């Protein structure tokens, strides 16, 4: 079993039950899934850029990404409906816990001038969104093979009903929030 999942079961669950006075252990919030999205805007003019982004996302997550397509045509961006413009991965179960563990312990501390992640990025339903400016913070990405610095959005979906519960869950799992 993954280190973070073990910590969740043995330490986080009992402390959350105690803090929020749940009547059952099953009421405790848990991480449901993690969605990583990489929008590749320049894929409109050069489709090869998307292949590189897909390759990097597969390296980072250990799972084959889904290529996302444009929902609407936008003339200003020379974009047609159905054109491939990005990639996304949905992680659940073991891979999700492995990715979260790696993100919290290895990748986020590698960000330049890192003072913790924002406490304000919750959506009101207990989900947390995190933007990353460069893919180089992940140890799997080889610096020499990177053609262009790309960012990504990471959405951590929890079963929590409020932001407060979700914040407490993520903080206990090791998410470095700003002081």
Curated annotation (Swiss-Prot):
Family membership: Belongs to the universal ribosomal protein uL5 family.
Self-association and partners: Part of the 50S ribosomal subunit; part of the 5S rRNA/L5/L18/L25 subcomplex. Contacts the 5S rRNA and the P site tRNA. Forms a bridge to the 30S subunit in the 70S ribosome.
Function: This is one of the proteins that bind and probably mediate the attachment of the 5S RNA into the large ribosomal subunit, where it forms part of the central protuberance. In the 70S ribosome it contacts protein S13 of the 30S subunit (bridge B1b), connecting the 2 subunits; this bridge is implicated in subunit movement. Contacts the P site tRNA; the 5S rRNA and some of its associated proteins might help stabilize positioning of ribosome-bound tRNAs.
PROSITE patterns associated with the record: RIBOSOMAL_L5
GO cellular component terms given for this protein: ribonucleoprotein complex; ribosome
Keywords assigned by UniProt, alphabetized: Ribonucleoprotein, Ribosomal protein, RNA-binding, rRNA-binding, tRNA-binding
Name of the gene encoding the protein in the UniProt record: rplE
GO molecular-function terms, A-Z: rRNA binding; structural constituent of ribosome; tRNA binding
Protein's recorded name: Large ribosomal subunit protein uL5
GO biological process, one term: translation
